Amino acid sequence: MAKTCEFEKEKLIVGVVYHDTDIYDSAISILKGEFGEIDNTSEVFSFSKEYSSYYDGELGGEGMRIILSFKETVDPSRQAEIKLFTNSIEEKFSVDGKRRINLDPGFISHGRLLLATTKKTGFRIPLSDGIYSELTLFWARGAWHKLPWTYRDYQSERVQRFLTKTRKIYLGQRTEI
């Protein structure tokens, strides 16, 4: 008979698209209150100029992108719960039903990046409460590899540098356990 075991904790990241820095600061404060210290941040860049102005109407202006990782590792079975929590933060700052900040949590393990989403499609795995998990990138032969559905920003050298550094931090944490 197959035996089950607990999942190994993984590195929580949150991708953020925002326009208003006050809302960004407040949302990050809430995230830190829930998940603790941030141990790595990507460069800030214009999501609107480099990828898409899709969020600009909701955000109230040019969307800026940053990705954060949290020091404490987290059980990946909490992915749906964490996405619901980040959705509640988006709702807290929304105006007339429009998000003023977009928060996308995910997990880095030694071999992959998962992102949580509410968007249903054939390559996403249902978790619970309307939340899906997406394998966004996988690590093999010393590099990140994309899939046909990988978002363009996650394919970029800039974001992959951040992910590689975060993965290295995570691998160091695994040896401490």
Which residues does each PLM region occupy?
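N-terminal short beta-loop-beta anion/metal-coordinating cradle
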Residues: 57
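Short, well-ordered beta-strand micro-motif
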Residues: 69-71
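Long, contiguous binding/interaction regions
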Residues: 1-53, 61-65, 74-103, 107-177
